[in-house]
């Protein structure tokens, strides 16, 4: 499904040249749970951002379902992100004044789906992560683990082929971290999950 071939990424700031990725190659299959481990500053998030189309690689190739991304234009990357990728971030990135349901629905607003269908899909996604009873709460009324579950529901509501999780348990206690990891393993039954930690 996803092939990373000799990907290189360098950040240049003035005279400073920082090589974040140097010839990285990986093959990732459907329905797989992959954890990428490494110390801070080792390029894990850069790799995740390249897989997710949030950042561009300098050389090498990212091959998606047998198709090279070397000639992708901005609209191709936009389509890839909107239809193929779900993102889960350590900081949740929830809108504090919106309900949990509205936060999840937001991921569907540019998809052209009717309001009723958006609501149904958002409710289903929240039920899938065990938050069906918390639809009308706001993020500040929830625990860290619950907010991460909302973020996972939001990432899943578009039914992406790939879920990317950037340190999803970094801000959680150990018991809640285990629960979130179990949820991500469950999610990997139906799609590729790539997590960095």
Identify the meaning behind each predicted range.
Residues 2-197:
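ABC family nucleotide-binding domain
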């Amino acid at each position: 499904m996803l092939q990373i071939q000799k990907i290189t990424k360098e950040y240049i700031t003035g005279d400073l040249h920082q090589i974040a990725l140097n010839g990285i190659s990986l093959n990732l299959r459907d329905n797989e749970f992959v954890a990428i481990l490494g110390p801070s500053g080792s390029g894990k998030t850069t790799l995740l951002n390249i897989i997710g189309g949030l950042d561009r690689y300098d050389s090498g190739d990212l091959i998606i379902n047998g198709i090279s991304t070397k000639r992708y234009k901005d609209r191709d990357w936009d389509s890839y992100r909107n239809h193929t990728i779900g993102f889960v971030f350590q900081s949740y990135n929830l809108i504090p004044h919106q309900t949990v349901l509205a936060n999840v629905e937001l991921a569907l607003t540019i998809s052209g789906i009717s309001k009723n269908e958006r609501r149904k899909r958002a409710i289903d996604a929240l039920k899938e992560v065990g938050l069906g009873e918390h639809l009308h709460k706001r993020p500040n009324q929830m625990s860290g683990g619950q907010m991460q579950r909302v973020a996972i529901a939001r990432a899943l509501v578009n039914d992406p082929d790939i879920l990317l999780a950037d340190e999803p348990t970094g801000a959680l206690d150990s018991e809640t971290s285990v629960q979130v990891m179990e949820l991500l393993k469950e999610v990997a039954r139906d799609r590729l999950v790539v997590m960095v930690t």
